[in-house]
Amino acid sequence: MKIKALSKLKPEEGIWMNEVDKPEMGHNDLLIRIKKTAICGTDVHIYNWDEWSQKTIPVPMVVGHEYVGEVVGIGQEVRGFTIGDRVSGEGHITCGHCRNCRGGRTHLCRNTTGVGVNRDGAFAEFLVIPAFNAFKIPAGISDDLASIFDPFGNAVHTALSFDLVGEDVLITGAGPIGIMAAAVAKHVGARHVVITDVNEYRLDLARKMGVTRAVNVANEKLEDVMSELGMTEGFDVGLEMSGVPSAFNGMLASMNHGGKVALLGIPPSDMAVDWTQVIFKGLVIKGIYGREMFETWYKMASLIQSGLDLTPIITHHYKIDDFQKGFDMMRSGMSGKVILDWE
């Protein structure tokens, strides 16, 4: 049986709609009928066919890894799922036999493969993944929100890396993940949450999500904002979401002594860092990749159930046949999360 999918078909700019074979389920897998998918920044990289994509992405391949769907098939070894369960899923498929997997630190698996990055992804009518990777969506959480659990998980993993209660938090990069991280920080009790970017549309989105200050660093100085807020000692926690070298070095300069920094944004490989800031301030730096399995997923559900409102971050919806409009909108930078509806 053939199904509709969005695939990287050629080693050049673009993503195309095509027909592929319906994926076959193994003994430990679930077959999921996709309801909604969201476009990730990674999908935009794949669309643009940048240097990272050229080195990483096999062609042809079905792309996409942010989704919500319904279980329609269950492998014979699988327990704990029933037909009709609403699920999203962890996009990092791990080996299960390396030291970190066996030690319960699966997010640090050295043999990780990515759904929609190294193997066929979720931008299709059906997806097969190991049942281990599926996460049941609690009742009361909408399909829209469930479809963005993957990037929300990046935000939660990064934001909750350090204690935020009563702390001053600086977030560099107001993409959807940075904005969601800011909302999490506010929700769990940070004092001042300041986010920086040069994209005024996204800074406005951050303001709607309740940040203390959204700062356009093209025309406002961070130190002025700090003194306006009565901050005399620098930020306690930094969350770097942009991958922009000047943003990271500006963050290091703005941190308090003993501050803690989590890095999610991927910088150029030759980024220069002012290491004296790190050494003399005694900063702690932590790299973040993906989500903790599955601690982050349970935290995400609990945060939404406890009143965290992420709905403003979802700005655009398109039918799957209008996927090109969705990608154009994401590439313009004038959007939050863009959702594609498969039903």
UniProtKB/Swiss-Prot annotation:
Keywords, alphabetical: Cytoplasm, Metal-binding, NAD, Oxidoreductase, Zinc
Reaction catalyzed: L-threonine + NAD(+) = (2S)-2-amino-3-oxobutanoate + NADH + H(+)
Pathway: Amino-acid degradation; L-threonine degradation via oxydo-reductase pathway; glycine from L-threonine: step 1/2
Gene3D superfamilies in UniProt: Medium-chain alcohol dehydrogenases, catalytic domain, NAD(P)-binding Rossmann-like Domain
SUPFAM superfamilies: GroES-like, NAD(P)-binding Rossmann-fold domains
GO cellular component entries: cytoplasm
Domain of life per record: Bacteria
EC number(s) per entry: 1.1.1.103
UniProt xrefs under Pfam families: ADH_N, ADH_zinc_N
Name of this chain's protein: L-threonine 3-dehydrogenase
Organism: Photobacterium profundum (strain SS9)
Taxon lineage: Bacteria, Pseudomonadati, Pseudomonadota, Gammaproteobacteria, Vibrionales
UniProt gene name: tdh
